[in-house]
A protein has these predicted regions:
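Inward-facing hydrophobic residues that define packing positions of alpha-helical scaffold repeats
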Residues: 28, 99, 170-171, 178
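Extended ligand-binding clefts on enzyme/binding-domain cores
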Residues: 15-149, 160
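Active-site acid/base region of carbohydrate-active enzymes
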Residues: 1-19
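Active-site-adjacent bridging/hinge elements
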Residues: 1-3, 124-131, 196-203
Length: 211
């Protein structure tokens, strides 16, 4: 998937990931019929993608969504598949169901969590560990870092689909998350729960200010 890891515990076990399948499908669809000589070509050197390959990817993608994979029940990476930049899902009901699950399970005041029980860059993460056992992932529940990046994905999608009320709401939310550096408004990679309020955030998710 987009996070370049295997299962949720990062044991290296391979999984099919909707974000990878969706990007591959979108890429093949974009390449189909491409003239390698560009606008000056005569059609003698065009890429022809077997439609069966695209159909297999479509079935695999629709079979996974709204999940990202077997171990990740929801993942913000799927926003890039159901909207900008891939727009890889034709089924509008599946698009809405996937978006609704991501917003419900992963949404927060500072953006979206990558996936549930994600310990990446939390204050309790052990950076010397390459993976965690499934029962150890509970220590990250409720304190997963939140990423403004995914609000930007949704903003671009909303603008391209001319959903202006939603675009304005997302723009307002993003503006509040920007930080000034050298006179520029920048967005941090993520917001995390400070060490001194980890227990309070675990008990009451969304109650503590992040940094």
């Amino acid at each position: 998937g987009i996070w370049e890891r295997g299962d949720k515990g990062n044991h290296g076990l391979p999984e099919r990931n909707a974000s990878s399948i969706g990007m591959a499908k979108a890429a093949l669809e974009s390449l189909d019929g491409l003239d390698l000589y560009g606008p000056h070509g005569n059609g003698s050197c065009r890429l022809l993608i077997p439609q069966g390959a695209i159909s297999r990817l479509r079935r695999a993608l629709e079979g996974l969504l709204p999940r990202e994979s077997a171990s990740k029940e929801a993942d913000s990476a799927c926003l890039s598949v159901i909207g900008y930049p891939a727009w890889a899902v034709e089924n509008s009901k599946l698009v809405e169901r996937t978006a609704r699950r991501i917003r419900r399970e992963l949404g927060g005041a500072y953006g979206y969590k990558r996936f549930l029980r994600d310990g990446h860059q939390t204050v309790v993460e052990d950076v010397s560990r390459l993976h965690y056992e499934p029962e150890e992932l509970a220590q990250f529940e409720g304190i997963e870092s939140e990423w403004p990046l995914f609000l930007a994905f949704e903003l671009v999608t909303a603008c391209c689909e001319q959903r202006w009320d939603e675009a304005r709401r997302l723009q307002t939310q993003l503006k509040a998350l920007a930080v000034e550096k050298d006179g520029e408004q920048l967005y941090p990679e993520l917001y995390l729960v400070p060490e001194q309020v980890v227990e309070q955030e675990r008990q009451h998710p969304g109650s503590q200010a992040r940094i």
